Amino acid sequence: MSNTGRIPLWLVGLVGGLAVITMLSLFLYGAYSGLGSSL
């Protein structure tokens, strides 16, 4: 942990994974709500 100037790889993976999960959940929620409202 000597390279404090760089962002840790696990932190990048964690943030990236959370962002992907959030975007996927929002996309699925929007698709389901759109289909429900259209039907």
From Swiss-Prot:
Source superkingdom: Eukaryota
Pfam families: PsbJ (PF01788)
Gene (UniProt): psbJ
Location in or out of the cell: Plastid, Chloroplast thylakoid membrane
Name of the molecule in the record: Photosystem II reaction center protein J
Similarity-based family: Belongs to the PsbJ family.
Quaternary organization: PSII is composed of 1 copy each of membrane proteins PsbA, PsbB, PsbC, PsbD, PsbE, PsbF, PsbH, PsbI, PsbJ, PsbK, PsbL, PsbM, PsbT, PsbX, PsbY, PsbZ, Psb30/Ycf12, at least 3 peripheral proteins of the oxygen-evolving complex and a large number of cofactors. It forms dimeric complexes.
Coiled coil: none
Main location: plastid
Chain's role: One of the components of the core complex of photosystem II (PSII). PSII is a light-driven water:plastoquinone oxidoreductase that uses light energy to abstract electrons from H(2)O, generating O(2) and a proton gradient subsequently used for ATP formation. It consists of a core antenna complex that captures photons, and an electron transfer chain that converts photonic excitation into a charge separation.
Biological process terms in GO annotation: photosynthesis
Membrane association type: Single-pass membrane protein
Transmembrane stretches, start-end: 7-27
Protein species of origin: Trieres chinensis (Marine centric diatom)
A Gene Ontology term for the protein's cellular component: photosystem II reaction center
